[in-house]
């Protein structure tokens, strides 16, 4: 029997590996290389250009933290833009809120969505059966450029790393358009990379520097993601009005009775308490 392993480079001398039971599918699209694997520990997982995007085992952590943090701060959010998110997990979580009226999901590569609908129904379950969701298969940077000013209450940038198709989602122009199309009390959540390895930390600081120049409130929160580089991952929270701690509406969120596996309002508070080494790196962007 072949001993097959998937390995992802996290640094020049560091790799993360998962033993693979089956290589389910492989395709080169006009945008990127897509692969689906099955493993014992992490279930089915998929990669884009050799980087893990999500696994069945730990996807709930990422998808709960990108959605429930802003929703607990402003429970009146109604119109949401998801940039990226082709696996469907972010849409699944945000559509759990009955108060959400409209979700636009902009994914550059339709094949990601269609293949996740085949191999990862755990996350893609809401993509075709909720009338509030509209999928757009185009470049997110171009979508926000022509979107209506002040239209969205929440933007969730559920993107890949700043290489390949995701590179344009880490630019000044993109963040400027996000600020413009958000309502007066709008919130932007941005995939902020990891603070640990040098190359990832560089991209984290680069993104944070651009965002904090455009929003009066710009903070960073953390979560534990076992299959991402170092396991220590960050989101950026930027807002025109709401502070993620001072305006946390814990009682309101808890009254909804949403069952989560990772997020809770106590964790919400702690997620913004960053280690000193992360604070030091963020201060270097000042």
Swiss-Prot record:
Protein localization: Cytoplasm
Where does the UniProt entry say this protein principally localizes? cytoplasm
State the InterPro entries in the record: PABS (IPR030374), SAM-dependent_MTases_sf (IPR029063), Spermi_synthase (IPR001045), Spermidine_synt_N (IPR035246), Spermidine_synt_N_sf (IPR037163)
Quote the EC number.
Answer: 2.5.1.16
Highest rank taxon of the organism = Bacteria
The biological pathway it contributes to is:
Amine and polyamine biosynthesis; spermidine biosynthesis; spermidine from putrescine: step 1/1
Q: What does this protein do?
A: Catalyzes the irreversible transfer of a propylamine group from the amino donor S-adenosylmethioninamine (decarboxy-AdoMet) to putrescine (1,4-diaminobutane) to yield spermidine.
The protein's name: Polyamine aminopropyltransferase
Source organism lineage?
A: Bacteria, Bacillati, Bacillota, Clostridia, Eubacteriales
